[in-house]
UniProtKB/Swiss-Prot annotation:
Belongs to the bacterial ribosomal protein bS18 family. GO terms for biological process: translation. InterPro entries: Ribosomal_bS18, Ribosomal_bS18_CS, Ribosomal_bS18_sf. It comes from the Bacteria. The keyword Ribosomal protein applies. Part of the 30S ribosomal subunit. Forms a tight heterodimer with protein bS6. Disulfide bonds: none annotated. This is Small ribosomal subunit protein bS18.
Length: 71
């Protein structure tokens, strides 16, 4: 019988995901500016949805780039 270790979320469930916290949001996008999938980030489904909304808001307000041309 094998046991699976439960992965802990990198963000505490009680912590809000804010679109103004650009340093936190940058951890969850690729160098090209794409949002990382949930299986890579280790977030819960609710946190991943909130993260996607926050990243999209930050992009609209020009806090994050839509497409990063540097990479």
């Amino acid at each position: 019988m094998s046991y699976f270790r439960r992965r802990l979320s990198p963000i505490k469930p009680s912590d809000p995901i804010d679109y103004k916290d650009v340093d936190l949001l940058r951890k969850f996008i690729t160098e090209r500016g794409k949002i990382l999938p949930r299986r890579i980030t280790g977030l819960t489904a609710r946190q991943q949805r909130d993260l996607a909304v926050a990243i999209k808001r930050a992009r609209i307000l020009a806090l994050l780039p839509f497409l990063n041309q540097e990479g």
